[in-house]
């Protein structure tokens, strides 16, 4: 489950970053080239997704689909078809299916093409390449060196996201002060150096490192802007979204704690009610609502009243 979960998180990340790649026209009349059953059984979830993508663009009826309907047809025949692998994984990670669908659509929307068909071809090329990068990156027990193998928790998988995030921040900081024409060169050098340093002696044993570095370079080369500063800005924004998606995917969703009502104790000897104070509440003086919920209405100009003992509407709360 862990490998599937983080594989698909990275799948979404690379789909976000890959953007428009050099389109490789599919061959519609070529019969699907699927591996023999035994090899397919052993393939990872991501590898099978690669096969499904490629097979969909090679089916005989594909040539007769109007260009404007390419993506809708693809969505109907691939995205909406029940997939036992995805369904099984989604039962263990509820957000998986939504992230998978989002990855397809983000990659498609980011694709560039003068015609709907050309745009679809660019989408297929970008998404297939992204899936291939991931297929070689996160295979069972091939992600991290044996010294980092764990049984209960995918520590290595979590750590690498943090390392990528840290390396990105270091590289972006270094690139910001570089001349426009040198920004990506500076970024690439700093990024690779930071990754090597953060993984220390284990760098060579991380099989996905070369693919990661290649994906970074490909993402930069795929941007359509001509001006170096604009091209770098587009690349940096895409990679930032990717790392954010990876970081969010690795967080364990926890339901927010529901506020506890204040406890009103019996009257003390002096006649005053003793309140077991919860957290103080800041209320907008003008509108009587919680200050956090009133920031837009007051545009940050709230004059808060602090209520002790929980909610300002609860019995026992009082102003100060």
UniProtKB/Swiss-Prot annotation:
Belongs to the Poa p IX/Phl p VI allergen family. Residues 21-45 are annotated as: Disordered. Gene3D superfamilies: Group V grass pollen allergen. The keyword Signal applies. SUPFAM superfamilies: Group V grass pollen allergen. This is Major pollen allergen Pha a 5.1. Residues 1-23 form the signal peptide. Residues 22-37 have a biased composition (Pro residues). Keywords: Allergen, Signal. It comes from Phalaris aquatica.
